[in-house]
Amino acid sequence: MKQLKGKKALAAILTAAMTMSLMACGSSGSAATEEKPAEETQETAAAETTDTAAEETTESSDSGMDALIEEAKAEGKLTVYGSCEEAYLSAACQKFEEMYGIQVDYQRLSTGEVYTKIEEEAGNPSADVWFGGTTDPYNEAVAAGLLEPYQAQNASHLISDTYKDPDGNWYGIYKGILGFMVNKEELDRLGLEEPKDWDDLLKPEYKGLIGMSNPSTAGTAKLVINTMVQMKGHDEAMEYFKELDKNIYQYTKSGSGPSKMVGPGECVIAIGFLHDGITQILSGYDNIDLIIPASGTSYEIGATAIFKGCKNENAAKLWVEYALSPDCVNIAKENESYQFLVIDNAEQPEEATQFGLDPDNVIDYDFEDAKQNTATYVEDFFNAVTNGSSENADSSRFLTE
């Protein structure tokens, strides 16, 4: 590119010389060539300066990315803790390995399990990056100083600053809408109507029919708790969960667990992310209906982050750049993950809108409150539903395996 600039300068000098020559010849004719106004000349010069600066910025960015790739390749290895679905996690890791020749090891864990592991490892993590899963546990990790800030180049493609931590501790890659999934055949058999809103879930006729994930292991459940606190206020939310618990059949380890129970009829109503319901419908369970709560709902930002003290720092940084690119996010829908994507050069999954989901039909979720108070709210939840801590919870209902 620098050589091209030199040629452009030479061409400009020759052009100027030819123009002066033509002007000299033209002055003997009927009309002399008019000079351009000073303002127009200044505008042209400014535009050329801007173009040159943009070229230099692009060159610098490309050079920086090339250097990062080489440094990551020199490390040669990356370990990923993934909290998205297994199919997408596996495909994303395989694609990264194919693109960069870096060996990738991965393990699928719920967000709660990841947080527990990195908290215990205290700055000496056995993995390098976290991929997928809602950001409430990520924000807990930020507050505990367990994530490494990184200013990602590809973050410029995020459609809003909402989808990243202000200090670069995590970056969003997708957005999932919280709601209900119901087995319409079972509801018909039982002579029950579909729930339309959060408070409907408290009706006595739904006793033992509802599935939800376990707040001690699943970020999805933590989001449900935060959502109710933000919509109802703290005390009313805890009373809500105390009543809701009477209708809960089981609290699953994974956030997607309840969605997998609805189709076969293991539970009749599931609380979780509606894209997980789409996965089940497209897998053959057309007896499932998706419901967006009438009074409003919230959403997850599925994220990626680097663990503080990781062993393969450059490979970890390259993973974040990769996760914020179409190479990574566009393969989600090919692997049973139908969340809305939050980068501007991604291909949105048509399946999400076909089932009536709207990424903007959500409450103004307070991420800062979630960052500061999630751990407290989870403790308050268990105090409300078990009259004690999570250790007192019935293990046959609150699954951890």
Enumerate the language-model features and the residues they cover:
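Short, polar/charged alpha-helical segment
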Residues: 47, 64-73, 77-79, 83-103, ...
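Conserved C-terminal helix/tail region of periplasmic/extracytoplasmic solute-binding proteins
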Residues: 359-401
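Bacterial lipoprotein signal-peptidase II cleavage site
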Residues: 23-36, 43-52
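Extracytoplasmic ligand-binding site segments that recognize negatively charged/polar headgroups
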Residues: 79-93, 105-121, 125-266
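Periplasmic-binding protein-like
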Residues: 176, 240-245, 251-252, 284-308
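A ligand-binding cleft/hinge motif common to bilobed small-molecule-binding domains
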Residues: 136-140, 268-287
